[in-house]
């Protein structure tokens, strides 16, 4: 019996890890990966950090170049797909080539959610999703330049830190009343706001751009009436899923390809993962998780489902952010207002804990990354704690 052919569409973390997971879990059939980028699949997190700060930055490949040949995975780089061929099971490229598939994994990622007012600036306006974006930004982030960043989410704050470290004068504009409002708890939001302000970043909350004039400098008029002048304008206000191919194939989409817990779409032969995917929960709600770890997890889940194997158990959600000399790691549930703090954030060393009826459900570490493994184990086991003991620095965490 002929073995099936699996095609992966995409060139990022989820795409590469799907290929790796399929081979690791025993798939020996024909395996192809199609990407519209010329590079090997590469890590995205460094784009807002080391790719802007290091003297001679290099892209970090998800898998080494030799892995693809050794594992007999056919890479098709720099190609554009015309149709997925859902009915015919034939992927068609814009160059006329067609490729048969039995199962499909879509990991086409996402683009920056557009902001037409700033997009009208053309090359004077920047977003950050790909290696080419980072290369362009690196050229313009020069000392003493005035940089305006719209959006105070994770990427916006990382860009503010990198721009400041490159000698720029950074201003961040945020519509909400706080920074990192979607994915950090209140005490961490307050810490980050103060950290950036101490570094010289001006952060304007509860504000937005109303008018833009492109001249020698870019003039931005805010809702507050203030006018800012910028040499460089960057924005990051969310994502727009690259789900056009899926929509044209009549898959279920909602600013992302809708998947179930097995990463399966409404077509049982088509799977999706990473930033392009959005999961329908048991209660019918749609949930998106934009992180490096989620891309890895969904790649592994999809590979298992495609091969008819048991699905792996998911660890608590985890992501990290490097800003200035700080490394922050977020694990578990970030919801809730009653967070406990161990240590002193003013010394750039602390852990915030989220207890619910004594059970640890989430945590954020500040330059304490070595504790994440233990905290992950606690969250997975549903361990309960005495709040006083948990926050007492004289008691080693591993003894609790």
Swiss-Prot record:
The reaction(s) this protein catalyses: 2 reduced [2Fe-2S]-[ferredoxin] + NAD(+) + H(+) = 2 oxidized [2Fe-2S]-[ferredoxin] + NADH
Cofactors demanded by this protein: FAD
Binding site for FAD: 5-36
Top-level taxon: Bacteria
Role of this protein: Part of the multicomponent 3-phenylpropionate dioxygenase, that converts 3-phenylpropionic acid (PP) and cinnamic acid (CI) into 3-phenylpropionate-dihydrodiol (PP-dihydrodiol) and cinnamic acid-dihydrodiol (CI-dihydrodiol), respectively.
Subunit structure: This dioxygenase system consists of four proteins: the two subunits of the hydroxylase component (HcaE and HcaF), a ferredoxin (HcaC) and a ferredoxin reductase (HcaD).
Protein name: 3-phenylpropionate/cinnamic acid dioxygenase ferredoxin--NAD(+) reductase component
Organism: Escherichia coli O7:K1 (strain IAI39 / ExPEC)
The encoding gene: hcaD
């Amino acid at each position: 019996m002929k073995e099936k052919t699996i095609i992966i569409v995409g060139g990022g973390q989820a795409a590469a890890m799907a290929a790796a997971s399929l081979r690791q879990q025993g798939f020996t059939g024909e395996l192809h990966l199609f990407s519209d980028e010329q590079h090997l699949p590469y890590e995205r997190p460094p784009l807002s950090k080391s790719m802007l700060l290091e003297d001679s930055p290099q892209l970090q490949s998800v898998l080494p170049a030799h892995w693809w040949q050794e594992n007999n995975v056919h890479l098709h780089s720099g190609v554009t797909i015309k149709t997925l061929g859902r009915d015919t099971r034939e992927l068609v490229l814009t160059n006329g080539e067609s490729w048969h598939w039995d199962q499909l994994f879509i990991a086409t990622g996402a683009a920056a959610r557009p902001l037409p007012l700033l997009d009208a600036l053309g090359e004077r306006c920047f977003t950050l999703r790909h290696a080419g974006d980072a290369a362009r930004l690196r050229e313009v982030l020069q000392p003493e330049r005035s940089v305006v960043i719209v959006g105070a989410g994770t990427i916006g704050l990382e860009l503010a830190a990198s721009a400041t470290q490159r000698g720029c004068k950074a201003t961040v504009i945020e519509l909400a009343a706080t920074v990192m409002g979607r994915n950090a708890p209140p005490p961490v939001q307050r810490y980050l706001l103060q950290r950036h302000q101490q570094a010289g970043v001006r952060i304007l909350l509860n504000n937005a751009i109303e008018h833009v004039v492109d001249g020698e400098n870019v003039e931005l008029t805010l809702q507050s009436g203030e006018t800012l002048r910028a040499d460089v304008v960057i924005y990051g206000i969310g994502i727009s899923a690259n789900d056009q191919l899926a929509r044209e194939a009549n898959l279920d989409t909602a600013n992302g390809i809708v998947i179930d817990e097995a990463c399966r779409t409404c077509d049982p032969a088509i799977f999706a993962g990473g930033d392009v995917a959005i999961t329908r929960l048991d209660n019918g709600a749609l949930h998106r998780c934009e992180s490096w770890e989620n891309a890895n997890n969904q790649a592994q889940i999809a590979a298992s489902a495609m091969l008819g194997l048991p699905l792996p158990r998911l660890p608590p959600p985890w992501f990290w952010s490097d800003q200035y000399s700080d490394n922050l790691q977020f694990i578990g549930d970030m919801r809730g207002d009653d967070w406990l703090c161990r240590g002193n954030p003013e010394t750039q060393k602390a852990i915030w804990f989220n207890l619910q009826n004594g059970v640890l459900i989430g945590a954020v570490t500040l330059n304490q990354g070595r504790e994440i493994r233990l905290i992950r184990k606690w969250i997975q086991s549903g361990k309960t704690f005495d709040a006083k003991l948990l926050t007492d620095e004289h008691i080693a965490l591993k003894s609790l």
